[in-house]
Regions:
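Bacterial N-terminal signal peptides that target proteins for export
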Residues: 1-9
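Hydrophobic h-region of N-terminal signal peptides that target proteins for export
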Residues: 12-21
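Patatin-like phospholipase
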Residues: 22-62, 70-390, 405-406
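Flexible glycine-/small-residue-rich
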Residues: 166-169, 178, 278, 343-345, ...
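Acidic/histidine-enriched alpha-helical segments
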Residues: 238-240, 310-327, 524, 566-569, ...
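Gram-negative/organellar outer-membrane beta-barrel architecture
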Residues: 367, 372, 384-550, 554-557, ...
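C-terminal outer-membrane beta-barrel translocator/porin domains of Gram-negative envelope proteins
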Residues: 397, 411-420, 447, 534-536, ...
Length: 731
């Protein structure tokens, strides 16, 4: 490609002007301290430096200062940096939990069960303790977004030379990081011990550099600095009156050591240097959501030092030339020639490659790559997934670096409880075990069980048939024994039990993150029994159920328990066919639809579902049921049963209190309105709507790590009143 001679001459003159100007003026080292979220204030300082046309010749950062400094060193525009931190979903980044929209449906299926909100990784069938409190997949992805996926090994080759400061966990020595994978170096500098895992660097295990050198003024002078602009965002000392908690005392103890070294560094500043200390009031080192306030505080403090800063300002022409030099040094991506997977033991590299949105011969689309990596991470096999772009002559090698969990066996446990504060209470203990990657296509075996009022055991072998997992076959076996309450005059007087024992084979297709479709053939023995003497003979009925079915599920709710947006739909059809050996011939279809709408802080969760026997007569064990919490709440559990039914429910709620992320999501207060009906007629008819029971009430609920709690107080037709307290999935 040819360039006009005038363009070449202009660029050359700009470069020569910049070199000459740099030789005449003092070189400026920008030194950014650590301080957790308070370090976002550094961006406000950068905005003022840009407006004042003050160039930066090198940057040194510790902890959060290393993050802002690293982004700056790559040539990232300050406005882009500001937008990135003010729009970031910090709860998601630090929670390290996949967004539900990214989770494949075969993982979402667990949301329909009463498991606690955590998964145990097993090694040799023993739980593996967590290595740290906070995962690092999403925060590392965020750092890669800030640095643009560059291919620079030596930090002197960055548009602005850069150093990050860390501490060696073993020796306590200061580690000056001057080369390597920049996003990992940034993470190493802010890896608070016990919260984030240490990062290997050369022969060190690096953690947050703030504990040894929170402000590297001396390193700034070594790197380039004739003068130093130092920004101190560390937390101020806490007075005695506020040292009342264990956390406050621990934080103060660390802060004493940090401040001691910082004051020694600050004491080396000369009259030619500039020290900027933003005043951030009550904002703390964990207030990442207040990014805009931190940036404003940084701007205010820098403007207060503007007179000192202007000593090093350039003219408009010279500053543009300096910026042009930065842009010409910025990394430019080359086409991808090869993709390789490293560090994978049992997860198939071929499966991972099939899921990556990367095309050979094209320049990397970082946003697209991050999206596909996040979807792979959401499968639940990895602690984190990193990548590197390695330069070649004309192209780049993309290396994917997945870090697998310590085992491929996973366990979940849970609990469900219910009481209507009268004579109906129940509980159940649930547990699940899963072994993943039985073969190179990603086969999984899982077993689930429940002990309590409901007793069940289910096992399935889930075998994908293609690399990307789009199609699968799943043979299964189950025993399921559940109660059916007998209700008279709105009181539960006795209980029947229904047992299904058998198995089947499903073949299906995964609809990406949206859902799945299954076709099944099954054979089960069905039996029901009763606690009432006068119906025991009839209740001893046992019959063979052989047939085929279809299930289709669409699931895009953002939260399965208390959604704010999204849809969920399910179609379930089954035909017990005497031609296949079934003792009875019948059909049933059930359609369930849910949608969440949110206005400001208020959410309306609408549900509509209905079922029909399609003109056949359903056995007692297969009849549709209504009654119980959030299932026509004013009625007792199983009070209404028949061949056809419908239910509509509107649940409007608002979150009234936050729960710490380690304990759950929030507390909700809502209003409930339900109506529905059940008919024993074989065919769906308008008579189903002639007399429709209803229920209205108030719901107090909490989204916790143990599961969703609901306290429902409802009033219905015929002067019905009920209260239900429930732990577990109710709909």
């Amino acid at each position: 490609m040819k360039f006009p001679s005038k363009t070449v001459l202009t660029v050359a003159l700009l470069a020569l002007t910049t070199v000459a100007q740099a030789a005449q003026r003092p070189k400026v080292a920008l030194v950014l301290s650590g301080g957790g979220a308070r370090g976002i204030a550094h961006i406000g300082v950068l905005k003022v430096l840009q407006d004042a046309k003050v160039p930066v010749d090198c940057v040194v950062g510790t902890s959060m200062g290393a993050i802002v400094g690293g982004a700056m060193a790559t040539g990232m525009p300050v406005n882009d940096m500001e937008q990135a931190v003010t729009t970031a979903d910090w709860d998601h980044i630090f929670g390290d939990k996949p967004k539900r929209k990214d989770i494949p449906y075969f993982r979402k299926r667990d949301d329909e069960k009463d498991y606690f909100d955590f998964t145990l990784t097993l090694k040799d069938f023993w739980p593996v303790p967590p290595r740290n409190l906070v995962g690092v997949h999403y925060i590392t992805q965020f750092f890669r977004q800030l640095t643009g996926g560059l291919e620079v090994e030596e930090f002197d080759d960055l548009p602005i030379p850069y150093r990050a400061i860390g501490a060696d966990l073993e020796s306590g020595k200061t580690v000056i990081m001057r080369h390597g994978d920049l996003p990992l170096v940034m993470r190493a500098s802010m890896s608070v011990s016990g919260v984030f895992p240490p990062v290997p660097y050369e022969n060190y295990l690096v953690v947050d550099g703030g504990i040894v050198k929170n402000m590297g003024i001396d390193e700034g002078r070594k790197l380039c600095g004739d003068v130093v602009i130092a920004v101190n965002v560390s937390s101020p000392s806490t007075n005695r009156q506020k040292l009342e908690s264990l956390f406050a005392v621990s934080e103060q103890t660390i802060n004493i050591a940090v401040q001691k070294d910082m004051q020694a560094q600050i004491a080396t500043l000369t009259p030619q240097d500039v020290l900027i200390t933003p005043e951030m009031g009550k904002l703390s080192s964990t207030d990442f959501k207040e990014a805009s306030q931190f940036i404003a505080a940084g701007e205010k403090a820098a403007k207060a030092s503007l007179k000192q800063l202007q000593r090093y300002a350039l003219s408009e022409t010279d500053y543009q030339a300096w910026q042009q030099q930065i842009q010409t040094r910025k990394f430019k991506h080359k086409p991808i020639s090869k993709v390789e997977i490293t560090g994978s033991h049992w997860v198939s590299p071929q499966v991972l490659k099939s899921l990556l949105a990367v095309k050979k011969g094209e320049v990397l689309d970082q946003a697209q790559l991050h999206d596909s990596i996040d979807k792979i991470y959401a499968r639940g096999d990895f602690v984190r997934i990193g990548y590197q772009l390695l330069p070649e002559a004309q192209n780049s090698l993309l290396r994917i670096i997945p870090v697998e969990k310590d085992g491929r066996d996973f366990a979940r446990i849970g609990l469900n409880l219910h009481t209507d504060f009268a004579n109906n209470s129940s509980f159940g203990l649930v547990a699940g075990l899963r072994r993943s990657w039985l073969n190179q296509l990603g086969a999984e075996w899982q077993a689930e069980g429940e002990l309590g009022e409901t007793r069940s055991l289910y096992t399935e072998l889930y075998q994908p048939t293609v690399l990307n997992g789009e199609f699968f076959v799943a043979p299964w076996l189950k025993i399921h024994d559940e109660p059916r309450d007998i209700v008279s005059d709105h009181e539960t007087t006795a209980q029947n039990r229904v047992r299904h024992t058998g198995g089947g084979v499903d073949i299906g297709s995964v609809l990406g993150k949206w859902g799945e479709v299954r076709l099944s053939v099954s054979e089960q023995r069905v039996k029901w029994s009763s606690s009432l003497e006068n119906v025991k003979t009839v209740a001893g009925e046992s019959y063979q159920q052989t047939g085929y079915g279809l299930k289709a599920i669409f699931d895009q709710l953002d939260n399965p328990r208390f959604p704010r947006k999204g849809n969920w739909a399910k179609l379930d059809y089954f035909h017990a066919d005497q031609g296949m050996g079934s003792d009875k011939d019948y059909q049933h279809i059930n359609i369930d639809w849910r949608r969440a709408f949110t206005w400001q802080n208020y959410t309306l969760f609408a549900t509509g579902r209905g079922g029909s026997s399609l003109g056949t007569t359903l056995p007692y064990a297969e009849q549709f049921q209504l009654g119980g919490a959030l299932n026509l709440s004013a009625y007792r559990r199983s009070e209404l049963a028949g061949n056809n039914y419908f239910l509509t429910r509107l649940l409007a709620y608002k979150q009234i209190k936050d729960i710490p992320p380690a304990l759950g999501g929030g507390v909700y207060l809502g209003l409930l309105a339900e109506t529905g009906a059940v008919s024993m007629e074989d065919k769906w008819s308008s008579r189903l709507f002639e007399s429709t029971p209803y229920s209205v009430g108030v719901v107090l609920a909490a989204d916790t790590r143990l599961g969703p709690f609901y306290l429902t107080i409802a009033k219905g037709d015929q002067d019905r009143h009920t209260a239900n307290l429930t732990l577990g999935v109710t709909y």
